[in-house]
């Protein structure tokens, strides 16, 4: 789960082309502009993670650790929230990311590729397989260890920013239809991550805070039903809901999703509040929120690391889940759906490219690290999880790139000319 920042509106209500038409139509220029932004964001994300790794393995490591533990407190009257900087990033900044996810999910379901059942079938099947495969691999590696089983969801997520960054390196060898398919698959992946967080990684609940959070949610959707289009009203209520959800015991990032879903897609006077906010948030998330998250979560000391450390069942479950479970789940589910006639491959793609894409979904990175902090809040497995996620993500990215680097068949004339 990855880390998703998906495409802007590249189709209209009047015409919702499938992957083939999308790959060849004029509105694709908007998608291509976004993909350039997202690919650049993936590069920044990679740079932030690299800097964190360097700092964590240098004489500056104590300063890096002190920065993450820096206490930050906000108090308004009798309400006080005090957390180390690391948790402000994970609970606060990531709520902004999930609000963007909510905006994008709403748009895609109501107007985008997922509004059409035939277009949605293949990415839905691929995403479901891509979540089930890694989970089963992790469960197989850790069966019988009740504590370790809490981490079953860690390898189910895909970091879309990194995956798109790899596709960008391929140039014309990665057809636009393949990128659109990856984006659509990532939407379902993020929906799955949201549901997993809500159902399986919720701490003990505070009834009073939960009631207030519910009131905030009701007020958000009441604004929508009343025709309110000023996004400031939604954001203010969103902050209130975030505080209540944080205090309730449910993970606070879910407040971001709910806020995004509540903002109107269209207004009566022709404006598009959700679309406008989505466009405004894109650069902040791609070049701010996600790189900051990577910087604060990817730093892991490698001193004393031995091969035996990677053979612990938790690391094996995460690593094999991302490396093996992801590709088998995505590829297997897509192959079955194509064989039984449920869906067809995106136009201009072949099975080798689909397999390369399946490998790229094994880039868990930011979302896998994020779910890891929820599954194991204590520091007992912190370093082990980070090492497994980082190593598996790098191998998945490398293998996916090599497979897609030489698409042997099924290239379109445009691709052959471009090469």
Regions found by a protein language model. Give the residues of each.
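Hydrophobic alpha-helical transmembrane segments in multi-pass integral membrane proteins
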Residues: 136-137, 196-197, 246-250, 290-304, ...
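Structural signature of hydrophobic alpha-helical transmembrane segments
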Residues: 86-98, 146-161, 184, 202-218, ...
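Functional cores that coordinate and move charged inorganic groups
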Residues: 167-264
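Entry/N-cap segments of selected transmembrane alpha helices
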Residues: 108-135, 206-215, 302-328, 351-355, ...
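Transmembrane alpha-helix boundary signature
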Residues: 55-67, 83-86, 100-117, 132-153
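Predominantly late transmembrane helices and immediately cytosolic-facing juxtamembrane segments
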Residues: 4-6, 13-37, 53-57, 70, ...
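Hydrophobic core segments of alpha-helical transmembrane domains in multi-pass membrane transport
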Residues: 44-57, 97-103, 133-138, 216-222, ...
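Transmembrane alpha-helices that form the ion-translocation and gating core
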Residues: 123-164, 317-375, 391, 398-406
């Amino acid at each position: 789960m990855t880390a998703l920042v998906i495409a802007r509106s590249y189709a209209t209500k009047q015409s919702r082309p499938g992957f083939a038409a999308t790959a060849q139509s004029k509105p694709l220029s908007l998608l291509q502009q976004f993909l350039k932004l997202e690919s650049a964001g993936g590069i920044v994300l990679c740079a932030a993670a690299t800097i964190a790794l360097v700092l964590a393995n240098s004489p500056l490591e104590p300063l890096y650790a002190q920065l993450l533990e820096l206490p930050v407190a906000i108090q308004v009257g009798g309400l006080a929230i005090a957390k180390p900087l690391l948790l402000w990033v994970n609970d606060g900044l990531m709520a902004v990311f999930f609000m963007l996810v909510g905006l994008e999910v709403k748009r895609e379901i109501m107007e985008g590729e997922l509004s059409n059942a035939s277009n949605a079938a293949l990415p839905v099947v691929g995403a479901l397989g891509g979540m089930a495969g890694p989970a089963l691999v992790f469960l197989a590696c850790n069966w019988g260890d009740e504590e370790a089983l809490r981490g079953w969801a860690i390898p189910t997520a895909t970091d879309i920013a990194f995956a798109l960054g790899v596709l960008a390196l391929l140039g014309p060898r990665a057809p636009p239809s393949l990128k659109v398919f990856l984006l659509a698959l990532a939407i379902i992946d993020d929906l799955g991550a949201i549901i997993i967080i809500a159902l399986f990684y919720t701490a003990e609940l505070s009834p009073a805070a939960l009631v207030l959070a519910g009131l905030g949610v009701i007020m958000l959707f009441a604004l929508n039903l009343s025709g309110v289009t000023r996004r400031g009203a939604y954001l203010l209520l969103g902050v209130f809901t975030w505080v209540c959800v944080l205090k309730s015991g449910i993970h606070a990032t879910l407040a971001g999703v709910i806020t995004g879903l509540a903002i109107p897609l269209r207004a009566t006077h022709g404006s598009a509040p959700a679309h406008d906010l989505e466009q405004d948030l894109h650069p902040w998330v791609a070049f701010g929120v996600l790189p900051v998250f990577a910087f604060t979560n990817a730093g892991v000391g490698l001193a004393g690391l031995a091969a035996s450390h990677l053979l612990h069942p938790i690391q094996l479950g995460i690593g094999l889940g991302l490396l093996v479970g992801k590709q088998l789940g995505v590829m297997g589910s897509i192959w079955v759906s194509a064989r039984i006639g449920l869906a067809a491959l995106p136009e201009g793609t072949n099975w080798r490219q689909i397999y390369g894409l399946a490998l790229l979904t094994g880039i868990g990175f930011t979302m896998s690290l994020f779910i890891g902090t929820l599954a194991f809040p204590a520091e007992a497995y912190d370093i082990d999880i980070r090492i497994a996620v980082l190593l598996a993500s790098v191998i998945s990215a490398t293998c996916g790139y090599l497979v897609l680097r030489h698409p042997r068949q099924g290239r379109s004339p445009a691709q052959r000319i471009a090469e």
